[in-house]
């Protein structure tokens, strides 16, 4: 199914608007040969989110051509914030001669779940009472990797503040500059 990535980095962004934003939805008309999984990949949305947005579908494994599905989409301000964090991180990496990190919608999805979990359970830690370690969480979301790291932030209002906070932390800076990470 999923191919083994050369290496991954997992960056978690915590901010008030990321936690409280509501997902917008669009409608998708199923065409022959589609599955909910294929639709999830097409829109870069988790399968579980599509299933949740479509309670009228009694069996998610059976969808039919011309059936209309609701597709939840992320708020553009959230994805823009995340992309800016990646861009600023890549500036730091480039200054050290490292390859840029790629945006990865599946890792971003995991990060949003972790962010929501920290908000719901009122903690700030790399170990989640719900998901365990970041590495277990990545595996449990079906993502294969060879190496991974986690940077978390809380209270920063801008992407620059997030990246500067990480840069001023030895452990987070090491993750930012890890040459083994690609996503």
Outline where the language-model segments fall.
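Disulfide-stabilized extracellular recognition modules
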Residues: 150-183
């Amino acid at each position: 199914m999923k191919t083994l990535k050369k290496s991954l980095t997992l960056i978690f962004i915590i901010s008030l608007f990321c936690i409280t934003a509501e997902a917008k939805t669009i409608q998708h008309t199923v065409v022959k040969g589609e599955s909910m999984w294929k639709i999830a990949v097409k829109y870069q949305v988790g399968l579980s989110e599509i299933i949740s947005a479509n309670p009228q579908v009694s069996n998610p494994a059976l969808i039919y051509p011309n059936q209309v599905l609701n597709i939840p989409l992320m708020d553009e301000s959230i994805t823009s914030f995340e992309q800016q964090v990646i861009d600023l991180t890549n500036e730091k990496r480039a200054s050290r001669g490292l390859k840029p990190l790629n945006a990865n919608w599946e890792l971003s999805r995991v990060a949003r779940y972790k962010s929501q979990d920290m908000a719901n359970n009122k903690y700030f830690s790399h170990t989640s009472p719900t998901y365990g370690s970041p590495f277990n969480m990545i595996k449990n979301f079906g993502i294969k990797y060879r190496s991974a790291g986690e940077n978390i932030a809380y209270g920063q209002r801008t992407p620059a503040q997030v990246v500067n906070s990480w840069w001023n932390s030895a452990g987070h800076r090491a993750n930012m500059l890890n040459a083994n990470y690609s996503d």
